[in-house]
Amino acid sequence: MRAVILAAGLGTRFKSEKPKVLHEILGKPMLWYVITNVRNGRIDDIAVVVGHKAQEVMEAFKNENLKFFIQENPKGGTADAVLAAKDFFSSYEGYVLIINGDSPLVSGETIRNMQQFIHMVRTYEGIKLGGVVLTTHLPDPTGYGRIIKEEGTDRIIRIVEEKDATPEEKAITEINAGTYIFYAPYLLEALYRIKPSPVTGELYLTDVIEYMVNKGYEVRSFMAKEPTEALGVNTRWDLALVENVIKLKIARYWAERGVTVHYPETVWIEPDVSIEPDVEIFPDVMLKGKTKIKKGSVIGKGSVIKDSLVEENVIVREYSVIENSEIKKRAVVGPFARIRNESVIGEEAEIGNFVEVKKSSIGKGVKAKHLAYIGDATVGENTNIGAGTVFANYDGKRKYESYVGKSAFIGSNSLLIAPIRVGDWAYIAGGSVVNKDIPEGALAVSRPELKIFEGRGKKKLQKD
């Protein structure tokens, strides 16, 4: 089996400079989903027909082992787009899947089932089908082509478009989902014989079906497992609706594998994310990129985790952001914490509210619970970092590193000016500005002398 994906459309209703098939759904281009579903349908020999901004599309998928064909006239119609890829199947004796690049909901399972249906008809009825059309029933079929069949069978007579349908035909709820499998020699024959529409000048794939039926090449319908598979993406609102369907499918996939997802309509889980059983995910969470969440962890409301590893039994409290970092076992992050740039938070460490950690290694059992900035630093195990502590790592030209040993104490509102080393068991008194290395076990105090002037405060407050 081979596949041709049609991705040449102008996408004018998107009102965008970007090709429609490159608009993203859960962090992936729309076309990625179609390619992935085709491959999940056990088809690896794939051609993509491009047209509008062809180079952008080809560049985006240059590493996907695809064959590209260019439709010279993007307004030539769907059959003209398939004809642009004729060299891909002109000498091929098998079947070809034709699917739109804006149909990301047609599942790999459905594609496999369509192939199996062709095989069963050949095996049990002795009929080599000319084609199979994916269909579904919609309660409101307005705008879709209606499937006209022989009564009591799945044999298609023709597909009639909404504008051409009689009142009786408009009452039909079975519609064309826009995905087809054709026997390649019959397809090629039909493509060369059909005529352009006298109204638009376009060549339509639905005319291929009518041609095959008239030639005696049997075409049958195959019902999609879910009506949503018929949803194409023609507008930004369609994109939002399709994204919501995929979002819920992904949430359900993980729920069926032992993950608790609260209020799944609000949870964003991208396709490359991996989650182990007994993870609990609260509303408004975003899990992005190649994030991995290990068993027993809890991800609090509104948190965003991208391209990061969260190990076992971690608690990420509300509205925390973690990017390109690792959170080790039993650590606690947040609420309102930010961890980024390849930081590592050690086992049982606590990074609390309004603490930012950037490109730093935080040891086991470290506590930084409030209002701190830790940048370009290594902090040894069991060290305490008080509220308001800042690691000053930038002098206006370059970044410098800091090292704090194990079991040290950094008092509240301390300023550590890098490059600097603070030894094990060192104690820095609150409010200190530290610009020299502190030896192991030493006490460092850096404060201006406090002066008290009796009675002066009241005088100032009462002054007119």
UniProtKB/Swiss-Prot annotation:
Superkingdom classification of source: Bacteria
Stretches the record annotates as Pyrophosphorylase: 1-236
Entry's Gene Ontology cellular component terms: cytoplasm; membrane
Binding site for Mg(2+): D102, N234
A biological process from GO: cell morphogenesis
Active site location: H370
UniProt pathway annotation: Nucleotide-sugar biosynthesis; UDP-N-acetyl-alpha-D-glucosamine biosynthesis; N-acetyl-alpha-D-glucosamine 1-phosphate from alpha-D-glucosamine 6-phosphate (route II): step 2/2; Nucleotide-sugar biosynthesis; UDP-N-acetyl-alpha-D-glucosamine biosynthesis; UDP-N-acetyl-alpha-D-glucosamine from N-acetyl-alpha-D-glucosamine 1-phosphate: step 1/1; Bacterial outer membrane biogenesis; LPS lipid A biosynthesis
EC number: 2.7.7.23, 2.3.1.157
Keywords, comma-separated and alphabetical: Acyltransferase, Cell shape, Cell wall biogenesis/degradation, Cytoplasm, Magnesium, Metal-binding, Multifunctional enzyme, Nucleotidyltransferase, Peptidoglycan synthesis, Repeat, Transferase
Essential cofactor(s): Mg(2+)
Residues noted as binding acetyl-CoA in the record, renumbered to the chain: A387, N393, Y394, S412, G430, R447
Function, as annotated: Catalyzes the last two sequential reactions in the de novo biosynthetic pathway for UDP-N-acetylglucosamine (UDP-GlcNAc). The C-terminal domain catalyzes the transfer of acetyl group from acetyl coenzyme A to glucosamine-1-phosphate (GlcN-1-P) to produce N-acetylglucosamine-1-phosphate (GlcNAc-1-P), which is converted into UDP-GlcNAc by the transfer of uridine 5-monophosphate (from uridine 5-triphosphate), a reaction catalyzed by the N-terminal domain.
Record protein name field: Bifunctional protein GlmU
Organism: Aquifex aeolicus (strain VF5)
